[in-house]
Amino acid sequence: MTLHEVPTILHRCGDCPIRHRAVCARCDSEELATLEQIKYYRSYQAGQTVIWSGDKMDFVASVVTGIATLTQTMEDGRRQMVGLLLPSDFVGRPGRQTVAYDVTATTDLLMCCFRRKPFEEMMQKTPHVGQRLLEMTLDELDAAREWMLLLGRKTAREKIASLLAIIARRDAALKLRESNGPMTFDLPLTREEMADYLGLTLETVSRQVSALKRDGVIALEGKRHVIVTDFARLLEEAGDDSDGGLPV
């Protein structure tokens, strides 16, 4: 695996774009200084594997920029995308060395990594880190439960609208923007990846995206740039209430 190490001096914690949402969100300046001593950066190209299922992972990390997918493979070779890692999401399990899924960069990916052992030691000494990680874990559990509803009960149109709403709200939160006005973002998944993630066919995804565009729910510039002029209407199409369903 070819990695491009990013000099730490280019990425001070206080200037980090995910500072207000990542595992370090509650840390004070002294705690951030401690984190600075154990962190390093790794970048991956789109399509590159970050780690394979079953491998030992000697680090934990936060996604700084880019998108990654979590995928599990069945014994007969069938694969299922089981999650997305968006900016500020945490990957790795303190106290557990192996991972249960493949992590693959969907776009060019930059990760802020912490060596596992020093990070685990810091969690013992710095309650803010452990508290924030617990909060993020509970949010992820809530999201998983909502996703069960989406996959089990929602129509194809509602599934597409729900995924767009999740990405739009996360993008707005990272940019510290309100989600009650026009929203624009780049869709991080191809149509094929959306189909895999949502349990739909490629043809169904393409048809439903086109229908949402035709009905004025979204606008598209190229294949990836999405414009949502009325977020409340998108939520209606998703079958969600005003909080957008899944945590951001």
UniProtKB/Swiss-Prot annotation:
Residue ranges the UniProt entry marks as DNA-binding: 191-210
One Pfam family, short name: cNMP_binding
SMART domains named in the record: cNMP (SM00100), HTH_CRP (SM00419)
Top-rank taxon: Bacteria
Zinc-finger found in the keyword field: no
Sorted UniProt keywords: Activator, DNA-binding, Iron, Transcription, Transcription regulation
Matching SUPFAM superfamilies: cAMP-binding domain-like, Winged helix' DNA-binding domain
Occurrences of domain HTH crp-type (ranges): 154-232
Other remarks on this protein: Possesses 4 cysteines which may bind a metal ion (possibly iron).
Function text: Anaerobic regulatory protein; transcriptional activator of hemA. Appears to regulate other genes.
The protein's name in its UniProt record: Transcriptional activator protein FnrL
Organism expressing this protein natively: Cereibacter sphaeroides (strain ATCC 17023 / DSM 158 / JCM 6121 / CCUG 31486 / LMG 2827 / NBRC 12203 / NCIMB 8253 / ATH 2.4.1.)
Origin organism lineage: Bacteria, Pseudomonadati, Pseudomonadota, Alphaproteobacteria, Rhodobacterales
Designated gene of the protein: fnrL
